[in-house]
Each structure stands twice: as structure tokens, then as C-alpha cells.
């Protein structure tokens, strides 16, 4: 009787639906399928737009339970690129990113809110210029699935804004230039 019960349980478990769990992904920066760009109003007349060329990170994601998502990103702030060498030197200096002292910025998620239809708010802590503050990213799950090379990918976009002074950047460029807008594109490859 015990053998029959054991066999029945094993057989049933083979045909039971598998529990879906979060998958771990590495952000695909090598294939240039991810970007961190920024925009700052320039004295109320136009915008300075740039990007960070060197960053890495990972995330876990389960479409059935997006609130369990975890995100970790590290940015090499020395890699800032606004397409103007002299300006980039200034941005790396003590007035802005102070990369001689703080060559890395990090973001670590603390919670995720599911707003429906793939819209998420990813709450976390941003450490920039030696200061750590809470930051919310308005994100959207673009899609996920098999890629042509046998891997599995998931992609997201995100936007956030923060005040420079909150991260110890004290230079006064006027009220229209006090905030940084970040645009994020993230494609992860399942580990």
C-alpha cells in the first residue's frame, strides 16, 4: 500500500503545473541592449543630454509576481559622456560627480509597486556622490521571451528625476537646471 501511495504521489507531481518563480537576469551591456541617459536643462534655454558608457547590474523578475522584483545596478561615473570633452571633465570634477572621490554610483531596489499593464514603480536607494537617498523609478515591462541564440530575455524602460542638491551637488545653475532626468533602457539575459 505504501508503494502504491508513493508511486501515486510521484506520478501526480510529474504532471502538476510547475510553480513559477523569479528568474535572475544580468543586464546586457555588452550587446549594447541597455542604456542610462540623462538630461539637464541648460540655463532655461536648452538641454544637455548625455549617458554613462560603463555600468553593470542584475535583476530578478517573475511576471506573475512583479512586486518581488529585485534590481541592483552599479555605474562607473567616470564614464559620463555628454559628447563634449571639456564639459565631461567639468562634470567629473568636484562641482558635480566628484569622480576622483566617488567613482561609482549604485542603485538597489527596496520594493516594487505593480500599477498594472506592465507599469511598475521601483523604489530603492541611489548612492551618488557619497550620498544615499531614496529614489522611485517609473518603469514599464516591455516584454520577455526566447531570443534567437537560445537564451531568454526580459526588457524594461524607466524614468526618474532627482534634485542635484539632494546628492551634495551644490553648484547653482539656476532653478530650471536644478534637476536631472534619467531615462533607462534595460534588457536582461537570464542567467
Swiss-Prot record:
Q: Where in the cell is it found?
A: Periplasm
**Hey, what's the signal peptide range on this chain?**
1-22
Q: Which InterPro entries match?
A: Lipid/polyisoprenoid-bd_YceI, TTHA0802/YceI-like_sf, UPF0312/YceI
Q: Which GO terms describe its cellular component?
A: extracellular space; periplasmic space
Pfam families xref list: YceI
The protein's UniProt keywords, in alphabetical order, are: Periplasm, Signal
Top-level taxon of the source organism: Bacteria
**The family this protein is said to belong to:** Belongs to the UPF0312 family. Type 1 subfamily.
Please report the name of this protein according to its UniProt entry: UPF0312 protein SO_3370
Report the source organism.
Shewanella oneidensis (strain ATCC 700550 / JCM 31522 / CIP 106686 / LMG 19005 / NCIMB 14063 / MR-1)
